[in-house]
């Protein structure tokens, strides 16, 4: 279910990325800090690159267990080697060993300082994994961050919100739409969707404000103006 094109981007794209987020730390705490045996007392970047190249060679040959071993050696030699963390995470993900991929993705995210496609892929994938496991307290941080990072991806917003709402986590669904409105303010359907959940939670006045916002963004739409009037009549 999780094997999407997003995952392939984790392996293929460059490693420069953005700021740390609290969710990554919580994943590391839950799944452990990926304690790897160190081969020496100091970081050896050159050795790390050597193991990384060997891991990539094995991965290209689809000798994944050998690739895993080399990537782990690379991380042991240089714990901040983002390429090795990302590629090892991607390998575990491909093999559907998701619990082993999670802390690696979290470590990769924490190392990043700029926004790139690799970071977007890592944050989005980790949010999907946590959401898929029902770890909503952890997934919400990644999901909100993914919306910030990928401001053109409106489809992921509805997937996130519907998952939370269907799981009885309406407040998280509301937070998703609020973040989406902040990042993509011109999308009236986000306001409409937010209003629907607020109505569901019997927050009618808040729902009315959301519908008014949608109507203001689409003044020629009778659908939104009618929604405003029907909601106002309930107060």
Predicted regions located by residue number:
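Conserved structural position within tetratricopeptide repeats
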Residues: 42, 73-76, 109-110, 114, ...
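Start-of-helix register in tetratricopeptide repeats
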Residues: 49, 83, 117-121, 155, ...
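Canonical tetratricopeptide repeat
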Residues: 53, 87, 94, 121, ...
């Amino acid at each position: 279910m999780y094997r999407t094109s997003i995952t392939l981007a984790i392996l293929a794209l460059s490693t420069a990325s953005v700021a740390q987020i609290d969710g990554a730390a919580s994943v590391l705490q839950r799944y452990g800090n990926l304690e790897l045996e160190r081969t020496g007392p100091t970081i050896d970047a050159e050795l790390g690159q050597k193991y990384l190249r060997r891991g990539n060679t094995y991965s290209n040959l689809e000798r994944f267990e050998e690739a895993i071993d080399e990537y782990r050696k690379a991380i042991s030699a240089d714990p901040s080697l983002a390429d090795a963390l990302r590629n090892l995470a991607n390998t575990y993900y491909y093999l559907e060993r998701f619990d082993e991929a999670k802390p690696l993705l979290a470590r990769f995210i924490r190392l990043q300082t700029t926004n790139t496609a690799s970071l977007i892929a890592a944050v989005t994938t980790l949010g999907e994994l946590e959401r898929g496991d029902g770890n909503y307290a952890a997934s919400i941080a990644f999901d909100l961050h993914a919306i910030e990072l990928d401001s053109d991806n409106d489809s992921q917003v509805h997937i996130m919100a519907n998952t939370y709402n269907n799981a009885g986590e309406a407040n998280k669904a509301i937070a998703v739409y609020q973040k989406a409105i902040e990042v993509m303010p011109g999308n009236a359907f986000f306001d409409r969707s937010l209003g629907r959940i607020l109505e569901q939670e019997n927050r009618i006045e808040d729902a009315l404000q959301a519908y008014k916002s949608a109507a203001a963004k689409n003044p020629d739409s009778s659908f939104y103006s009618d929604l405003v009037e029907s909601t106002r009549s309930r107060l």
